[in-house]
């Protein structure tokens, strides 16, 4: 069985580590990621942002904790240039899409409404609820 690379947007990872609103869905998604059918992926940008923000909300989080649960994907100049060519107002969203595409991710899970409705062709840009429904983990 092929492992599906699932890209998590920064907001999902922050929900997981900080207990923000939606933490239940984030917990379920990370639990699903422990199944060998999925590889949970995040960009290096997400890892950096989560460490920065979590200092206030999850002070015990260490940089070494993140790769225990998530594959950290590289970002490079080529992805940066591709992100510039996407017709998206939020450049960070464009970078995330570019990173996910370059690294073979099959879907992006995000709580960001602008990203969910950006109109970019990608195999799947899903809300946490949509993803959990697809795998049978609905509430």
Task: Please name every model-derived segment.
Residues 39-45, 50:
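Substrate-recognition element of Asp-dependent hydrolases with the DxDx(T/V) motif
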Residues 17-18, 54, 87, 119-120:
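Short, flexible helix/strand-to-coil boundary loops that buttress conserved ligand/catalytic motifs
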Residues 1-41, 56-60, 129, 133-139:
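Short, well-structured N-terminal submotif of metal-dependent ribonuclease cores
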Residues 52-74:
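Helix-adjacent hinge/juxtasegments
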Residues 13, 47, 80, 115-116, ...:
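A generic structural signal for short hydrophobic patches within well-formed alpha-helices
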Residues 36-37, 68-69, 86:
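Structured helix-beta-strand junction loops
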Residues 71-117:
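Active-site neighborhoods of divalent-metal-dependent phosphate/nucleic-acid chemistry enzymes
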Residues 102-139:
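Acidic, PIN/NYN-like endoribonuclease modules and their adjacent C-terminal/linker elements
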